[in-house]
């Protein structure tokens, strides 16, 4: 073979070898996407076919930057819960898998912001700055990572801190009929965390826009937005947003807890959450159970509230305190959702419509309220003065029923009733006016010592304010001792008793006048 032919052959060999090497090492730059189509769109849901590889609760993407969560995964089609405005979606539109689950922005940048469950800002303050993202659904802390509840969470409400104490890491249910002050108790608790190194997350689920705006205005006015994140879904939002709202709020709170911070999260309210889940389940043709709720409604709430805990020091020592709110109908505490949440939580605060109508605010029915773990976290200074108070108030509530029938009462019974009326008057307080620990202990000690018994009921509010103003003048070191595990010393007790007695002197009439002005 001639030299030119050899040269051509070797050149071709080199070329083919280079092509073979290129084919062997070639990696396609194309990313495969699984695309399905919408078969049907209904209120808040869409049925989708053509996504055989989709996972349960995987996020899927629709046109118009609308997302949904795969809720029902069947062999031929999936049921998707829509998380945005779906008015433009129609049968035949494409649907794409994202390969990830729903998550939310977390971090210090959310403090002071009002967002929706997707992390989108609602307050016209620009985009949300976040340091990380966390999945909405996260497993609760293992048992061995949890620590006992030992530190109190002061609400600033005398009736709660004294008789139904809450600890950091506890789950305390707030329930009552409509318009009985449930949200007011939660908001007052948030206001009282100012200066307490507690961050707050307020989650409004399916609430009226006007009511949410009022709550946010109160938080801004009192300076509470500095340490609060507000997660909002309105009544006209898709039910899917209402369903994921409490999980988003909990993930935001868990981020701070895992950093070693103490966090308070308020769910207002889980009745709307249960109704949104019921609506979605019925639309997806899931079998209904009691009151048409699906069979897993208990699990839906238990897996949410089990994420509230107090972590061991090795895990950072943070805590997440949950205050779920539930609305009852006609004072029926034994309905399905209320009984579920009573069994899940560590106690409940029940608000009575009867007390509300009498003007007793907050309208807490102490006999139907309980805190199962908060008592262990209550400060010793409280325990020293509240034990006798609980007994006296319970006796008063029992005897008050008989007094309404106009029965003749002996002198001792009349004293118990008069003392109980003054306890009830002292436990009342206006909205958005939390009371300091020193003020509460001074008032409660004066109540236990029966110093208020000589004060006419009409002057109880002024008398209590006088005691609170006097308590504000206590030495700083004495006020600091209240917030420790130390018991009240005899000297401190004597100081408080003398202070209360001096403050009440102008309000106690002479004996003859006292007999004329005492309540029947």
Swiss-Prot record:
Pfam short name (any one): ATP-synt_ab_N
GO molecular-function term, one example from the UniProt record: ATP binding
Keywords noted in UniProt: ATP synthesis, ATP-binding, Cell inner membrane, Cell membrane, CF(1), Hydrogen ion transport, Ion transport, Membrane, Nucleotide-binding, Translocase, Transport
Transport in keyword set: yes
The record describes its membrane topology as: Peripheral membrane protein
Show the stretches that span the lipid bilayer: none
Which residues make up the annotated site Required for activity?
Answer: 369
Q: Where in the cell is it found?
A: Cell inner membrane
Q: Which reactions fall under this protein's catalytic activity?
A: ATP + H2O + 4 H(+)(in) = ADP + phosphate + 5 H(+)(out)
Q: E.C. number, please?
A: 7.1.2.2
Q: Which residues bind ATP?
A: 176-183
Q: Does the keyword ATP-binding apply?
A: yes
Q: What is one GO cellular-component annotation here?
A: proton-transporting ATP synthase complex
According to the record's subunit comment, the protein's assembly and interactions are:
F-type ATPases have 2 components, CF(1) - the catalytic core - and CF(0) - the membrane proton channel. CF(1) has five subunits: alpha(3), beta(3), gamma(1), delta(1), epsilon(1). CF(0) has three main subunits: a(1), b(2) and c(9-12). The alpha and beta chains form an alternating ring which encloses part of the gamma chain. CF(1) is attached to CF(0) by a central stalk formed by the gamma and epsilon chains, while a peripheral stalk is formed by the delta and b chains.
The family database entries (NCBIfam families) matched by this protein are listed as: alt_F1F0_F1_al, atpA, PRK13343.1
The similarity comment for this entry is: Belongs to the ATPase alpha/beta chains family.
What role is this protein assigned?
Answer: Produces ATP from ADP in the presence of a proton gradient across the membrane. The alpha chain is a regulatory subunit.
Task: State the protein's name.
Answer: ATP synthase subunit alpha 2
Q: Which organism is it from?
A: Polaromonas naphthalenivorans (strain CJ2)
Which classification does the entry list for the species? Bacteria, Pseudomonadati, Pseudomonadota, Betaproteobacteria, Burkholderiales
